[in-house]
């Protein structure tokens, strides 16, 4: 019996679980005399992404998801883009790191939409940076294989669904964004960063002639 107000569980529609371990690492006091902006934050994020092992990703995600549940979130969409090992090589199990996320979610009891992210370039028409090596799909077909592996993995877990994801318009060739959209069926989630910074909008206009929409 409910004797007061009741609210439905919230949904976190955009999570990067491994970044929970960055708390306090990317903020600088003005007296530090160092950059303190999105780009310095990204350097900190890359540094972390190039250190975390599968067991770390699972433990960090479990800690984060426990906190989400404690604060009323019952479903999380995980925008998951670390897929490869520290050297940028594929794991024997392509879904290795996605499965670590799924195991963390099931262990704490939160519903999960896992979105393996397609990432292939370092900017509009630019090659990927070495710091991005754990994120990359080597081709469109390579990403489809990754997504298929994650879908197969997800069948082992309760309350786990899978979507398609593009990191950003700068992170994937435009023709591949369009092609991936054709693979979406029914209510399959499709997730993308439209733009993270003003510079990204400016670069998009310079490269395509239009804003990211």
Named regions from a protein language model:
Residues 1-7:
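Active-site metal-binding motif and surrounding structural segment of the metallo-beta-lactamase
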Residues 15, 19, 35-41, 210-213:
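Alpha-helix initiation and N-capping motif
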Residues 84-213:
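Metal-coordinating catalytic core of metallo-dependent amide/deamination hydrolases
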Residues 24-111, 141-157:
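Alpha-helical scaffold segments that flank or form the walls of functional sites
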Residues 11-12, 50-51, 165:
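Short capping/connector residues at structural and topological boundaries
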Residues 3, 14, 72, 79, ...:
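Conserved, mostly hydrophobic/aromatic
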């Amino acid at each position: 019996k409910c004797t007061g107000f009741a609210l439905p569980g919230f949904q976190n529609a955009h999570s990067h679980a491994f970044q929970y371990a960055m708390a306090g690492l990317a903020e600088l006091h003005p007296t530090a005399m160092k950059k303190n902006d999105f780009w310095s934050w990204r350097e900190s994020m890359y540094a972390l992404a190039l250190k975390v092992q599968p067991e770390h990703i699972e433990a960090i995600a479990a800690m984060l998801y426990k906190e989400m549940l404690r604060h009323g979130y019952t479903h999380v969409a995980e925008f998951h883009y670390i897929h490869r090992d520290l050297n940028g090589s594929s794991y024997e199990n392509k879904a290795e790191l996605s499965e670590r996320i799924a195991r963390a979610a099931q262990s704490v009891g939160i519903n999960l939409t896992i979105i393996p992210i397609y990432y292939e370039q370092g900017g509009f028409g630019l090659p990927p940076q070495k710091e991005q090596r754990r994120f990359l799909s080597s081709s469109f077909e390579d990403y489809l294989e990754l997504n298929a592996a994650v879908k197969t993995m997800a069948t082992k877990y309760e309350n786990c669904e899978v979507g398609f994801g593009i990191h950003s318009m700068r992170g994937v060739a435009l023709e591949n964004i369009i092609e991936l959209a054709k693979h979406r069926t029914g209510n399959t989630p499709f997730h993308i960063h439209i733009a993270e910074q003003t510079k990204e909008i400016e670069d998009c206009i310079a490269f395509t002639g239009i804003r990211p929409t």
